């Protein structure tokens, strides 16, 4: 059993803390909002103002603070403010502590902001007196607590091997015998994977809405069209389809059908900016603006690089 401190007790923090508590860990919630603390205490959980967390002997500290946008730009002020408390907690103990970042942050934030701040303020070294891992959450707001206990994927981005092992051990009651895929990777990859997940979901919804809008313009049931496409389009049901970067889509159908339908839409008065962007990106990749490292290395060495885009009969 570990002693876990949650820094930031919103949706993610509460789902994480309550989940770890159900797994048998000793959990204390920290937040700056009194009403949040009162509700947690009423539910039977230990909850204190975040500034008192250094007094709690936690072996793991989970950062689950909001990273909102203001005027379209990400704000890290809540995270930065919390780092002072976390550093004090690290400095106050001779025991190894694991810092787990659950915030959604741009790639490089953990390495370039979080770790240097913690080392400087605590006077201790990452990888020795404390560890750092980025553990992106893929929780849905409406079912966050259930999603924590029943994950479809776990991603552990870690500064060093011990950090990764310690983090996996926290989740061991969930992972044992449940065949949940676990990805151990570096910090930047874990940070980017969270964004890629959210950006893909957003792009898929916008694609559906663009098709739905075109269907409505044409007097077609867009919901029925997307229900069919969800089963007929390989990209909908094959999770590996189109996930190898650096290759344009090709074949007999995709290039001609995308350009033909965009022209048809323009002639019919249908605005399809997402489809236009899809074609633009593909043209850039085909022109060599985006080349995978392994292809560039092969070309530099005189070898040939294999590859191909998604095609399909048509």
Show which residues each predicted segment covers.
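NAD(P)+-binding Rossmann beta1-loop-alpha1 motif at the extreme N-terminus of oxidoreductases
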Residues: 1-56
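NAD(P)-dependent Rossmann-like dehydrogenase/reductase catalytic/cofactor-binding core
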Residues: 2, 6, 212, 216-314
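Alpha-helix C-terminal capping/helix-to-coil transition sites in glycosyltransferase folds
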Residues: 56-57, 151
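Internal alpha-helical scaffold of NAD(P)-dependent oxidoreductase catalytic cores
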Residues: 117-135, 140-237, 264-271, 277
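Rossmann-like NAD(P)(H) cofactor-binding subdomain of soluble oxidoreductases
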Residues: 60, 68-138
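Structural motif
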Residues: 62-64, 155
């Amino acid at each position: 059993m570990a002693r876990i401190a949650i820094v930031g007790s919103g949706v993610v923090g509460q789902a994480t803390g309550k989940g770890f508590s159900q797994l048998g860990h000793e959990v204390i919630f920290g937040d700056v909002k009194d009403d949040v603390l009162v509700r947690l205490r009423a539910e039977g959980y230990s909850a204190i103002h975040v500034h008192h967390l250094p007094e709690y002997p936690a072996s793991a500290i989970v950062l689950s603070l909001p990273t909102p946008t203001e005027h379209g730009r990400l704000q890290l002020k809540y995270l930065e403010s919390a780092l002072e408390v976390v550093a004090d907690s690290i400095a106050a103990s001779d025991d190894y502590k694991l810092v787990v970042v659950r915030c959604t942050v741009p790639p490089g934030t953990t390495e370039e902001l979080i770790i240097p701040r913690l080392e400087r303020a605590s006077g201790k070294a990452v990888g020795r007196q404390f560890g750092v891992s980025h553990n992106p959450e893929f929780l849905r707001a409406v079912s966050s607590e259930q999603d924590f206990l029943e994950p479809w994927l776990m991603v552990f981005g870690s500064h060093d091997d011990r950090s990764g092992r310690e983090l996996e051990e926290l989740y061991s009651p969930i992972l044992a015998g449940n065949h949940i895929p676990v990805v151990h990777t570096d910090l930047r990859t874990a940070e980017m994977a969270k964004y890629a997940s959210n950006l893909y979901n957003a792009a898929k919804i916008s694609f559906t809405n663009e098709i739905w809008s075109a269907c409505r313009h044409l007097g077609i049931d867009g919901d029925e069209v997307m229900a069919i496409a969800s089963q007929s389009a390989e990209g909908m049901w094959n999770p590996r389809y189109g996930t190898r970067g650096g290759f344009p889509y090709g074949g007999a159908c995709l290039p001609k059908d995308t350009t033909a339908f965009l022209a048809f839409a323009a002639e019919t008065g249908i605005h399809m900016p997402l489809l236009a962007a899809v074609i633009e990106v593909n043209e850039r990749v085909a022109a060599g603006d985006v080349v995978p490292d392994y292809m560039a290395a092969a070309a530099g060495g005189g070898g040939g690089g294999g590859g191909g885009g998604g095609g399909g009969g048509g």
